[in-house]
């Protein structure tokens, strides 16, 4: 373990360290949602003073800091020096950590990352909604590195850097990090970052390609090039040669997401697999799919166990996407209805059910679930169990509808809801409605480490109603 912070934890850290003796010191008590260390000063009369948010500091550490933003009740600061290091501090696994904004917690032991994320989840549930789970689930965790199968890479032609940069933004900046590799991307993709820079630099439109979307499937790695001007014949030849050499598939996006099309090789199928269920899921690189394939498989397994559906049950999958949960549920013998707000994803879910021979057990509908009413829910009829997997905005309208139906004495409410969340704040808000107004109890909740080394907190919760 390292007793000093990574010198790249902030661009100013190395130069500032020489003046550390002149900088104020604070004891760090916790981390906030952005993985910043949180400490509190003490006023001269002994009363609690300002809160200090220190980038790169960890709980239990005493650090010297330098403020860059001052407000009456708090300050935001850069880490200058670790005076007393936490036993949780480790050496970051990537040389670009601290400059690149892709990760914020590589300096923290992976087990401690999980513990902190679990605490963030429980704190949100209690402080925002006064809800506690009956049981805290064991965290769902997987590989710490090479897990990111989806990513959006920014492309920027920077004359001062001598050419094109391809990578994530610098931390809290619009600049692109000068990256030669990335430890959270699959190794074969990480190895392509420098060749991609060279490829784009050789194109006639090297300054008219703002981003590259990455989607890795079971056999195919797709790269979607956002092109603001057409490629010429020489450009196309360069792309074909690169695709053959690096075994990738190029897609082009001349305008909005609906204009994406496969360029070369056009005949390859992008798909991910769920081998435990004998399922193959074709998708387009612009479709929403989970970033972390390994965690997704474990998450599906836990969701199915928590639902504990019988073959005679009717199941409802809200925000179903391309059928990530719907189709595995259907393999268990139950009848499943998936509802999704995107027409494109609904169409893909229908096609995937047909592709996997599950059309007879599934049905799909396209509805705006952010504006759903109690009448809309009642019109669906009764489903025994629900799975809800909303985006960061959560499922507020759905939970409000359930609360209204509960208060009206409706019999359409499910006995069990499994809720997969990518925002502890919106999960807490929705849990408050379900528990305090819809008659449910929070039977269990736990974190899902979909994004190791970041402050993103994904989770799974189960609600039960007697």
Curated annotation (Swiss-Prot):
It catalyses: uridine(1939) in 23S rRNA + S-adenosyl-L-methionine = 5-methyluridine(1939) in 23S rRNA + S-adenosyl-L-homocysteine + H(+). [4Fe-4S] cluster binds at residues 94, 100, 103, 182. It holds the Pfam family TRAM. One of its GO terms (molecular function) is iron ion binding. One of its GO terms (biological process) is rRNA base methylation. Keywords: 4Fe-4S, Iron, Iron-sulfur, Metal-binding, Methyltransferase, rRNA processing, S-adenosyl-L-methionine, Transferase. The active site is at residue 422. Signal peptide: none annotated. Its EC number is 2.1.1.190. S-adenosyl-L-methionine binds at residues 290, 319, 324, 340, 368, 389. PROSITE patterns: SAM_MT_RNA_M5U, TRAM, TRMA_2. Belongs to the class I-like SAM-binding methyltransferase superfamily. RNA M5U methyltransferase family. RlmD subfamily. PANTHER family: 23S RRNA (URACIL(1939)-C(5))-METHYLTRANSFERASE RLMD (PTHR11061:SF49), RNA M5U METHYLTRANSFERASE (PTHR11061). NCBIfam families: PRK13168.1. This is 23S rRNA (uracil(1939)-C(5))-methyltransferase RlmD.
């Amino acid at each position: 373990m390292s007793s000093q912070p990574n010198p790249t934890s902030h661009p100013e850290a190395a130069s500032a360290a020489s003046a550390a003796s002149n900088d104020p010191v604070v004891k760090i008590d916790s981390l906030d949602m952005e993985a910043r260390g949180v400490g509190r000063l003490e006023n001269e009369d002994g009363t609690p003073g300002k809160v200090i948010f220190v980038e790169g500091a960890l709980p239990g550490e005493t650090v010297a800091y330098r403020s860059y933003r001052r407000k009456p009740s708090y300050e935001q600061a850069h880490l200058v020096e670790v005076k007393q290091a936490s036993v949780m501090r480790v050496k970051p696994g990537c040389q670009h950590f601290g400059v690149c904004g892709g990760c914020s917690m590589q300096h923290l032991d992976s087990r401690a990352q999980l513990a902190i994320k679990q605490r963030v989840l429980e704190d949100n549930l209690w402080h925002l909604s006064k809800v506690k789970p009956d049981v805290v689930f064991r965290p769902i965790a997987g590989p710490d590195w090479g897990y990111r199968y989806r990513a959006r890479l920014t492309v920027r032609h920077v004359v001062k850097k001598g050419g094109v940069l391809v990578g994530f933004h610098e931390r809290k900046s619009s600049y692109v990090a000068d990256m030669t590799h990335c430890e959270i991307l699959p190794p074969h993709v990480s190895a392509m970052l420098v060749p991609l820079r060279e490829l784009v630099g050789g194109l006639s439109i090297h300054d008219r390609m703002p981003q590259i979307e990455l989607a890795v499937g079971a056999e195919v790695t797709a790269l979607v090039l956002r092109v603001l001007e057409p490629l010429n014949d020489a450009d196309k030849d360069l792309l074909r040669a690169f695709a053959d050499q690096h075994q990738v598939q190029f897609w082009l996006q001349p305008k909005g997401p609906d204009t994406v099309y496969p360029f070369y090789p056009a005949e390859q199928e992008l798909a991910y697999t769920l081998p435990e269920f004998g399922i193959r899921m074709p998708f387009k690189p612009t479709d929403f799919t989970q970033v972390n394939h390994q965690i997704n498989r474990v998450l599906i397994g836990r969701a199915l166990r928590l639902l504990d559906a019988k073959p005679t049950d009717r199941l409802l999958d809200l925000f179903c996407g391309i059928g990530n949960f719907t189709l595995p549920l259907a393999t268990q013998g139950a009848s499943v209805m998936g509802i999704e707000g995107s027409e494109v994803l609904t169409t893909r879910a229908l096609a995937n059910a047909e592709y996997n021979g599950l059309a007879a057990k599934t049905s799909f509908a396209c509805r705006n679930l952010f504006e759903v009413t109690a009448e809309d829910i009642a019109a669906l009829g009764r489903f025994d169990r629900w799975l809800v997997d909303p985006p960061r905005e959560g499922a507020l309208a759905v939970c409000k509808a359930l609360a209204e139906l509960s208060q009206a004495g409706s019999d359409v409410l499910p006995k069990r809801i499994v809720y997969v969340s990518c925002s502890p704040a919106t999960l807490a808000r929705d849990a408050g409605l379900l528990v305090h107004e819809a008659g449910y109890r929070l039977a269990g909740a736990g974190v899902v480490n979909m994004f190791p080394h970041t402050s993103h907190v994904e989770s799974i919760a189960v609600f039960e109603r007697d």
